[in-house]
C-alpha cells in the first residue's frame, strides 16, 4: 500500500502567521471581528498545542491565546 498517514504540518513550538486570504474565506472569519490586528498576519506567533485541525497560537504580545485552523496558518520565516 502506498497510503501513508499525513504528517501534521506544524508542531508545538512552530512559528507561524495567519494567511490573510485563507482566513478571510473561512467560516471562522464570519463569526469573528472583521478588523483583526496586523500582528496576526505579520507574525510570528508560537504554536502551543495542536489538536485535530486546529492549533493554539500565542502571540508575542499581552493578548489571549487563540485557536486557529491549521490551513489558515503559514510557517513564519524571517
From Swiss-Prot:
Protein name per its UniProtKB record: NAD(P)H-quinone oxidoreductase subunit O
Keyword Lipid metabolism assigned: no
Enzyme Commission code: 7.1.1.-
Organism: Prochlorococcus marinus (strain MIT 9215)
Keywords: Membrane, NAD, NADP, Plastoquinone, Quinone, Thylakoid, Translocase, Transport
Main location, first listed in the record: membrane
Membrane topology (UniProt): Peripheral membrane protein
The protein's assembly and partners: NDH-1 can be composed of about 15 different subunits; different subcomplexes with different compositions have been identified which probably have different functions.
Function of the protein: NDH-1 shuttles electrons from an unknown electron donor, via FMN and iron-sulfur (Fe-S) centers, to quinones in the respiratory and/or the photosynthetic chain. The immediate electron acceptor for the enzyme in this species is believed to be plastoquinone. Couples the redox reaction to proton translocation, and thus conserves the redox energy in a proton gradient. Cyanobacterial NDH-1 also plays a role in inorganic carbon-concentration.
Encoding gene (name): ndhO
Reaction catalysis annotation: a plastoquinone + NADH + (n+1) H(+)(in) = a plastoquinol + NAD(+) + n H(+)(out); a plastoquinone + NADPH + (n+1) H(+)(in) = a plastoquinol + NADP(+) + n H(+)(out)
InterPro entries on file: NdhO
Subcellular location: Cellular thylakoid membrane
GO molecular function per UniProt: oxidoreductase activity, acting on NAD(P)H, quinone or similar compound as acceptor; quinone binding
This protein's record includes keyword Aminoacyl-tRNA synthetase: no
Family: Belongs to the complex I NdhO subunit family.
Lineage: Bacteria, Bacillati, Cyanobacteriota, Cyanophyceae, Synechococcales
Amino acid at each position: 500500500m502506498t497510503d501513508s498517514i499525513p504528517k501534521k504540518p506544524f508542531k508545538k513550538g512552530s512559528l507561524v502567521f495567519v494567511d490573510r486570504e485563507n482566513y478571510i474565506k473561512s467560516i471562522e472569519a464570519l463569526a469573528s471581528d472583521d478588523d483583526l490586528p496586523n500582528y496576526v498576519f505579520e507574525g510570528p506567533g508560537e504554536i502551543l498545542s495542536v489538536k485535530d485541525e486546529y492549533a493554539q497560537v500565542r502571540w508575542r504580545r499581552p493578548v489571549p491565546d487563540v485557536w486557529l485552523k491549521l490551513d489558515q496558518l503559514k510557517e513564519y520565516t524571517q
